Amino acid sequence: MLKIALLQVMPAETIEGNLKKGITACREAKAKDADIALFPEMWSNGYCIPSDADALRRFAVSADGDFVKRYQALALELDMAIAISVLESHEPKPLNSSILIDRHGKQVYKYSKIHTCDFDAERMLDSGADFYVADLDTREGPIRVGTMICYDREFPESARILMLKGAELLLVPNACPMEINRLSQLRTRAFENMVAIATCNYPSPKPDCNGHSTLFDGVAYLQEFPGSRDTCVFEANEEEGVFIAELDLVMLRKYRKEEVFGNAYRKPGKYGLLIDETINEPFIRKDRRV
């Protein structure tokens, strides 16, 4: 079993405070035998986006700066992968980024949120350039991992392109209320792509967050179970904590080889309209960015 620690923890009031609290949470994850520790969205500053551009820049950290390097050193020390999330320094605007660090302390990739919430505070941020998938070395062997962040979940293309790039597991830092419809989105993304999706949210009482971090394993059917099984194999409550979700990679890989979803029977030649950037009513929004 691959053990994923969902660090559903309240942020501190400072970047240094988040560094220390995050290190403590990672140590607890390791004590619980985790292979991967996943943080909520923009952990470095607790998902705080000031409306003043200069103040926002002061909150940002570099992808190769001390904040991230401390977690790289910690990953090496603990022999545990860490998916750390940051408000990343970038010009002309900061990025909402997640950096996957392997258990050897090396950065595997850096993903910056593509579907920024331009209708809200994230209009102060730049959006990312691409989706990335890479092999992550774990005690269970290599696993193909990709990342999407919070609002990315609401677009089927996010999980789909990660699946097409070979992802078996999607890591999702999150900062919003996880209610029935958003949880249903994650369930659907896992089901339709035959991928596992681990999501880590902030707990209550952080404003506009309510915990309910989850792991969906994407396996809807098993020979030994009649009908369809629940792909949600773990769901936390609203409280702060370090929660361990277990993923059966052997079962997932067998299922992906045999079932009919994912890329098995797609007809991409019929989907040309999906890359047409023309927007028509009722979907025209003045604050939309390309």
Language-model features: locations:
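Extreme N-terminal starter segment of soluble prokaryotic enzymes
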Residues: 1-5
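Short polar catalytic/cofactor-binding loops
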Residues: 8-15
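Cys-nucleophile CN-hydrolase/nitrilase-fold catalytic domain and related Cys-dependent amidase chemistry
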Residues: 15-16, 24-104, 108-110, 176-193
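Short, acidic/polar
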Residues: 17-26, 155-160
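CN hydrolase (nitrilase-like) catalytic-core segments centered on the catalytic cysteine
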Residues: 63-81, 153-243
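Active-site catalytic loop in hydrolytic enzyme cores
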Residues: 89-165, 173-174, 178-188, 195, ...
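C-terminal beta-strand edge segments of enzyme domains
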Residues: 133, 203-290
